[in-house]
Design a protein with these regions (language model features):
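Replication-associated primase and helicase/ATPase modules
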Residues: 1-17, 27-32, 75, 102-106, ...
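Phosphate-handling DNA/RNA-contact segment within nucleic-acid enzymes
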Residues: 2-103, 107, 115-117
Length: 182
């Protein structure tokens, strides 16, 4: 059980074990492969869906041990999503502000989510490349696309064909919001 395990590392992190249940453990490793945090993902409908525990004071970035920042890389919201994309990081949540380098941001496909729309607009205005999912993609995220039967290569092709930056990103974002406003 997740709370009990966490309490062995950080005594009394969870004073009560009520509602404790098994979770998928996702390790967050630094560039040297050392674990600095881990995330527990619920298997069912338990809430919260994700619980992230920091063992060291660092930004919650998954995949630092797997990505080559000297090359173009991708950044998405969830660790599981990042596993399906080559040279990809994941940030805890959708705060991409602290990242540096040549990267493309891949937000979840939630066009009606006001917070994600604000983050997309902020990312575009910052000058970063961004993926704006085409209308035919109905799945919420990369993991759901894979679960629906798409191959890793198909997802990568959709990402490549729907990456925008600068004025093109602003124009496409305006269209994307209108198309998905219903």
């Amino acid at each position: 059980s997740f709370y009990k395990f966490t309490n062995t590392l950080i005594p009394n992190k969870f004073p009560s074990l009520d509602g404790d249940h098994p979770r998928l453990l996702i390790p967050f490793r630094d560039e040297q492969g050392e674990i600095f945090a881990y995330q527990g993902r619920a298997f069912g409908i338990e809430t919260p869906k994700y619980i992230t525990i920091k063992l060291k004071e660092r930004d919650k970035i998954f995949g630092l041990d797997r990505v080559d920042k000297s090359k173009h890389f991708y950044v998405c919201e969830g660790p599981l999503d990042s596993l399906f994309i080559d040279n990809c990081l994941a940030v805890g949540g959708s705060d991409f502000d602290r990242l540096e380098g040549d990267f493309t941001v891949i937000f979840d496909n939630e066009p009606r989510n006001k917070e994600i729309n604000k983050q997309i607009e902020k990312t575009i205005n910052k000058g970063s490349s961004i993926v704006l999912w085409p209308e035919q993609v109905k799945e919420k995220d990369i993991n759901d696309m894979i679960l629906s039967g798409m191959s890793k290569e198909e997802v990568q092709e959709i990402i490549t064909n729907n990456t925008f930056s600068g004025a093109g990103a602003k124009l496409r974002f305006t269209e994307w919001r209108k198309i998905n406003a219903y």
